[in-house]
């Protein structure tokens, strides 16, 4: 699918899927399992970052090595799975996807074997040329390498890519492949942090697609 036309890569958690409340709830299960403090939605959005082990260590006030993070990651995902059926798509997710004129794909740092059937459950599979999730047993890492592999499988040049996501890590991943990012304020990251990044920022997914079209047109 090697093409000079713009290609849109969507993030899933906190972007197309409105799961912020569930993520914060599951994160607090992790923190309280070690006797740590809980965080509010706003606190999570200010402090959350990848690698997630660094975020956990900051809140807990103690080092979190790989073995400990693996254990905490299992606790998180067990709690997350129990509430997943309560999550809905972002209010304008379907409208936003329909507004993009070119090809689009989905890349998530959630486990691939769970992501694919979940996307199908929401009736979205047909919108994407490819759906990729994490193919490892422990999550929490950064997105750049996964994006490189995702685009290689698609045979898409990174310079033709715009990524819509809700985190600074999404933007860093896009830059790493020579692409562009539009950041969405409805997810896991405080809007002030997103705006300070210098990347285009949108309060709705529909507006994010509009901005993605603008930045992709400017690069052509």
Q: What annotation goes with each model-predicted range?
A:
Residues 37, 125-129, 157:
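Conserved H-loop
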Residues 1-46:
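Active-site neighborhood of HAD-like aspartate-dependent phosphohydrolases
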Residues 81-106, 112-116, 144:
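Short, acidic loop-to-helix structural element flanking the phosphoryl-transfer center
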Residues 162-201:
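Acidic, Mg2+-coordinating phosphoryl-transfer loop and its flanking beta/alpha structural elements
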